Amino acid sequence: MEKKSGRSACVAVIRRACAADMEEILQLVGDVFEEEQGIPRALNPIPPENCPQWWCAEAEGRIVGAMAAFVEDGSWHVGRLAVSGAMRGRHIATGLMKTVAASIFDQGADCIYMEARDITVAIVKKLGGRVTGEPVLFYGERLTPAVLERGRFEG
């Protein structure tokens, strides 16, 4: 999909990640979370028992964005949304959220839950999601619980 903004045009292909992508995805997620947000890399892994599924955005042969979906306490969740700094402002995060949500709904989920930073909450609201509680501080930034429901999804 082509993404345009005030920056130069970029073609980012959003797709389900494969095993060969995981090293680059985990490096990107670690860099964004630790270096930009101060969240230790040790908090990034999703336990295998949560059956994580990863998607990535690829541009010019490299991974520039990623997002995971996983099952926790019997419900679908999304998280670990990361876009490289140089590629922000091109709607890659929105594309990832739309693609991941559509796939999880296709797998039978009725709701997808998340605890998200303000910018992600704005994306989720545009896609028909809603805030479900009060924000909490996590490493100095607000995390707000939100849900995206199949019947309200505008993707």
Please describe what each predicted stretch is:
Residues 71-81, 88, 138-140:
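A conserved beta-turn-beta hairpin within the catalytic core of GNAT-like acetyltransferases
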Residues 104-117:
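Conserved GNAT acetyl-CoA-binding A-motif
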Residues 2-41, 54-58, 150-155:
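Short amphipathic alpha-helix that is part of the acyltransferase structural core
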Residues 83, 89-102:
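Conserved acetyl-CoA-binding loop-helix of GNAT-fold acetyltransferases
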Residues 45-51:
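Short loop/turn motifs at secondary-structure junctions and domain boundaries
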Residues 124-125, 129:
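Conserved active-site tyrosine of GNAT-family acetyltransferases
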Residues 56, 62-70, 77-82:
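Conserved beta-strand in the GNAT
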Residues 113-115, 130-148:
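Conserved catalytic-core motifs of GNAT/GCN5-like acyltransferases
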